[in-house]
Amino acid sequence: MDDNKAKALKAALGQIEKQFGKNTIMHLGDNSATLDVDVVSTGSLGLDIALGIGGLPKGRIIEIYGPESSGKTTLTLQAIAECQKQGGTCAFIDAEHALDPIYARKLGVNTDDLLVSQPDNGEQALEITDMLVRSGALDMIVIDSVAALTPRAEIEGEMGDSHMGLQARLMSQALRKITGNAKRSNCMVIFINQIRMKIGVMFGSPETTTGGNALKFYASVRLDIRRIGAVKSGDEIIGNQTRVKVIKNKMAPPFRQAEFEITYGEGTNHLAEVIDLGVEIGVVGKAGAWYSYGDEKIGQGKANSVLFLKDNPAIAEEIEAKIRAEKLAVEPEKGAEAVDEVEPESEVE
């Protein structure tokens, strides 16, 4: 760049910082430009690895969707518990009015410190979310769920009234405000979403998520969570076998997936994941039904090995640290997304 252009650029940058504040614009290579993203674990080791950065990114919009009883709320409550362990403050916007505090405590959530709101309508829920984000005091906000964010006009109207695209416009308007504020305050906003079926789809998947297209565009990470089987103890079903696909990821390559067990009343079977992933990378040895770590046998069968790790948390942490070091050693590609996308302007649901 020649001297005249350099002087003009310096003057422009000075004027921008004077008018809009320091660090409004900067070179990407500056030390003041934060490139490393803070993350919060999902509570599932396999999913943290599938996300490519070790967890969910702070300061971003996240969407978690799937069928009923697939583990969406469980996953978000585990993320809240992990965020609280880091000293973070979290809020739960319970639009479905279905939060179970007893179950939340079982998953490790400190319910005394968790902020909870049960809004009357969608506008109120999103306004509360935006105010909390702008406060700069929160680290994570969960909205459960997008489908329950009913517009005020629909609540005040008659049954059977048509409100075409009202929720989609509400979401689009709210996300335009929340996205920038979330980045500035480094607050993660997680939207739980439900699945609906499109009518008359001949080819491709008829499934779609509620709330229009805006959330698909603004979300940095989209997770598709499904129940793929049952976990049994004898004849009794004690949990779900769950698969989570990373449908979109702006922080690392997308389309990775993780499979893990969710035990009823307990959440993700974290230690079973540690054993499976340990065997995969060779940290944990497996000979027949026996599992071993180093020269020590840790159990016959996975269930006994899990009990051993539960009684020896230091060994479990050591194995997990080796797994994370091995699996997250490669620097992820930045800006990888599932599909080419266009900014949403006008949309209907």
UniProtKB/Swiss-Prot annotation:
The keyword Nucleotide-binding applies. Keywords: ATP-binding, Cytoplasm, DNA damage, DNA recombination, DNA repair, DNA-binding, Nucleotide-binding, SOS response. InterPro entries: AAA+_ATPase (IPR003593), DNA_recomb/repair_RecA (IPR013765), DNA_recomb/repair_RecA_CS (IPR020584), P-loop_NTPase (IPR027417), RecA-like_C (IPR049261), RecA-like_N (IPR049428), RecA_ATP-bd (IPR020588), RecA_C_sf (IPR023400). It is found in: Cytoplasm. PROSITE patterns: RECA_1, RECA_2, RECA_3. Pfam families: RecA, RecA_C. GO terms for cellular component: cytosol. GO terms for biological process: DNA recombination; DNA repair; SOS response. ATP binds at G66, P67, E68, S69, S70, G71, K72, T73. The keyword DNA repair applies. GO terms for molecular function: ATP binding; ATP hydrolysis activity; ATP-dependent DNA damage sensor activity; damaged DNA binding; single-stranded DNA binding. Belongs to the RecA family. Can catalyze the hydrolysis of ATP in the presence of single-stranded DNA, the ATP-dependent uptake of single-stranded DNA by duplex DNA, and the ATP-dependent hybridization of homologous single-stranded DNAs. It interacts with LexA causing its activation and leading to its autocatalytic cleavage. This is Protein RecA. It comes from Psychrobacter sp. (strain PRwf-1). The gene is recA.
